[in-house]
């Protein structure tokens, strides 16, 4: 019951923290110029979070689970398993098994990231295919962008929830706390970034709050469902396939898609950027906005460095 109460507490904290962070742009009245700056900062936070927090944490979770698995087994059992695999694979060198494990993990990293990215790409295409039937293609594109951004972050948050539920099922408090801190480090900035992006896109405040609530609920609900729904045998199987790390890396792929394909182009287009050679509108972002974008990218990096120490 101890594990259940801890996952409940973590889920509740995640819900409240995420929702409060998301209401900051709504609570403060920004001018047009300041709203643009906040949106750019939010875009930077999304990108920095994906690159500096989620991917490293996912990779760390993968390798940590492998190393713990090696240390936790009895030495005789490990030697027997290794020798059996060596006979099966024809590996002579003692380092062969170690290298094989690392190759397998490298494959996990790439596959998880790419699947997350491709999943969001397909969701985006399906969503935009439904939208293109509208008479006004520009309005349809904008609506599709809002929905995809929210949906992408909700899918990402759901994957986070699965990661936390899988971490809780390992019964290791340190793993639970690391995953929780990693998720909160990027969920709060992501909520801020999502709300500022939706405000810039011109959504009504009531609808923005609904989007935010869905985003805030996704991770806690999925964490509880994952934890409660897993039988002991499933938990053991999940720990064998490094579920926590894989789920985090999959969510990083969805996050990268949302940040790079939707939010950044929207932000870049705000300054009337033009790629035409003689285009006088090719201003792009102002120096202040570029500074805000870079700052947004660096904040998660600084937070993650502080968290590691």
UniProtKB/Swiss-Prot annotation:
The lineage of its organism: Eukaryota, Metazoa, Chordata, Craniata, Vertebrata. It is found in: Cell membrane; Cytoplasm, Perinuclear region; Golgi apparatus, trans-Golgi network membrane; Mitochondrion. Glycans are attached at residues 29, 242. Signal peptide: none annotated. It catalyses: Zn(2+)(in) = Zn(2+)(out). Disruption phenotype: Homozygous Knockout females fish for SLC39A9 show significant reductions in fecundity, embryo viability, and growth of their offspring. Furthermore, a high proportion of eggs fail to undergo normal chorion elevation during activation. It is a multi-pass membrane protein. GO terms for molecular function: androgen binding; G protein-coupled receptor activity; zinc efflux transmembrane transporter activity; zinc ion transmembrane transporter activity. Coiled coil: none annotated. Belongs to the ZIP transporter (TC 2.A.5) family. GO terms for biological process: bicellular tight junction assembly; egg activation; intracellular zinc ion homeostasis; regulation of cellular response to testosterone stimulus; regulation of vascular endothelial cell proliferation; zinc ion transmembrane transport; zinc ion transport. This is Zinc transporter ZIP9. GO terms for cellular component: mitochondrial membrane; mitochondrion; nucleus; perinuclear region of cytoplasm; plasma membrane; trans-Golgi network. Has dual functions as a membrane-bound androgen receptor and as an androgen-dependent zinc transporter both of which are mediated through G protein activation and are required for the androgen-dependent apoptotic response. Upon androgen binding, mediates apoptosis by directly activating a stimulatory G protein that leads to increased cAMP levels and MAP kinase activity and which is accompanied by increased intracellular free zinc levels. May play a role in the proper zinc modulation during egg activation. Keywords: Cell membrane, Cytoplasm, Glycoprotein, Golgi apparatus, Ion transport, Membrane, Mitochondrion, Nucleus, Transmembrane, Transmembrane helix, Transport, Zinc, Zinc transport. The chain crosses the membrane at residues 7-27, 35-55, 107-127, 147-167, 177-197, 211-231, 245-265, 285-305. Pfam families: Zip. It comes from the Eukaryota.
């Amino acid at each position: 019951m101890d594990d259940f109460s801890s996952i409940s507490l973590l889920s509740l904290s995640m819900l409240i923290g995420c929702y409060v962070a998301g209401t900051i742009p709504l609570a403060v009245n920004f001018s047009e110029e300041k709203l643009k700056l906040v949106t750019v900062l939010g875009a930077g936070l999304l990108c920095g979070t994906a690159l500096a927090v989620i991917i490293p944490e996912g990779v760390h979770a993968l390798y940590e689970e492998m190393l713990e698995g090696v240390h936790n087994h009895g030495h005789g059992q490990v030697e027997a398993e290794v020798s059996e695999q060596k006979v099966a694979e024809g590996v002579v060198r003692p380092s062969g098994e170690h290298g094989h494990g690392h190759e397998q993990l490298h494959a996990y990293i790439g596959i998880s990231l790419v699947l997350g990215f491709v999943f969001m790409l397909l969701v985006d295409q399906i969503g935009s295919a439904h939208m293109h039937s509208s008479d006004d293609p520009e309005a349809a594109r904008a609506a599709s962008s809002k929905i995809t951004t929210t949906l992408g972050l909700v899918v990402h948050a759901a994957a986070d929830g699965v990661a936390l539920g899988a971490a809780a099922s390992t019964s290791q408090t340190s793993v639970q706390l690391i995953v929780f801190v990693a998720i909160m480090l990027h969920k709060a900035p992501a909520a801020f970034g999502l709300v500022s992006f939706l405000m810039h896109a011109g959504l009504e405040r009531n609808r923005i709050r609904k989007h935010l609530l869905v985003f805030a609920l996704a991770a806690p609900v999925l964490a509880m469902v994952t934890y409660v729904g897993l039988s002991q045998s499933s938990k053991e199987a999940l720990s064998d396939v490094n579920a926590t790390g894989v789920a985090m890396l999959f969510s990083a792929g969805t996050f990268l898609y949302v940040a790079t394909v939707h939010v950044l182009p929207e932000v870049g287009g705000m300054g009337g950027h033009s790629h035409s050679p003689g285009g006088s509108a090719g201003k792009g972002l102002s120096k202040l906005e570029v500074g805000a974008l870079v700052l947004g990218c660096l904040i998660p990096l600084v937070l993650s460095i502080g968290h590691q120490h």
